[in-house]
Amino acid sequence: MMKMCRYALITALAIFLAGCAGLREQPAPVEEAKPQPQQPAQPQPTVPTVPAVPSVPAQPGPIEHQDQQSGQPAPRVRHYDWNGAVQPLVGQMLQASGVNAGSILLVDSVNNRTNGSLNAGEATTALRSALAGNGKFTLVSAQQLAVAKQQLGLSPQDSLGSRSKAMGIARNVGAQYVLYSNATGNVNAPELKMQLMLVQTGEIIWSGKGAVQQQ
């Protein structure tokens, strides 16, 4: 009786183990893969490229001028012996023939025709001083000449600049003669040229020239 029970127990255990082995050998269920719908790729928005800004070159600063007074020598001021130049020329003119004593003479300002700058006003002053008190001509006063120049739109210091203007003013002030003078040549050694003209005809009665020395 005991043997039968042992046999039955062994048989039952063998069946149980065989069942467990069968359960282990069964494959796991395979799930069918379902295709997923593909989403269309979203286009990436294009980002506009910003052009590179060119670099601005550094602007030069304001140009600073050096003080000309301290950095450069002052221009040379020339002084001339106008009295020494006009005295002999006036003496020659007063000895000229064909000049009626007591005639009215217009002395035009000396014109600067040199290649540089000079004070022609000093030459005019020296010329009028040399003629002052002569016994042959009566000079048109500086006031009369200034008024006549203003009528032409000129300042009293302006030279008439041409023989035709000098003759026109001489007629306006009632002068019979005009003394027309130029400083010419090199400004370092100018030459003074003078012409005495008859207003009525424009004839040159006398002419002369002389060197002007620097002082």
From Swiss-Prot:
Which GO-annotated molecular functions does the record name? enzyme regulator activity
* Cystines in this chain: none
Q: Where is the lipid attached (N-palmitoyl cysteine)?
A: 20
Q: Where in the cell is it found?
A: Cell outer membrane
Write down any Gene Ontology CC term: periplasmic side of cell outer membrane
Compositional bias of kind Pro residues: 37-48
**Where is the segment annotated Disordered?**
28-78
Looking up InterPro entries in the UniProt record yields: LpoB (IPR014094)
Quaternary data: Interacts with PBP1b.
Q: What family classification does the UniProt entry report for this protein?
A: Belongs to the LpoB family.
Role summary: Regulator of peptidoglycan synthesis that is essential for the function of penicillin-binding protein 1B (PBP1b).
What is the protein named? Answer: Penicillin-binding protein activator LpoB
To which species is this protein native? Klebsiella pneumoniae subsp. pneumoniae (strain ATCC 700721 / MGH 78578)
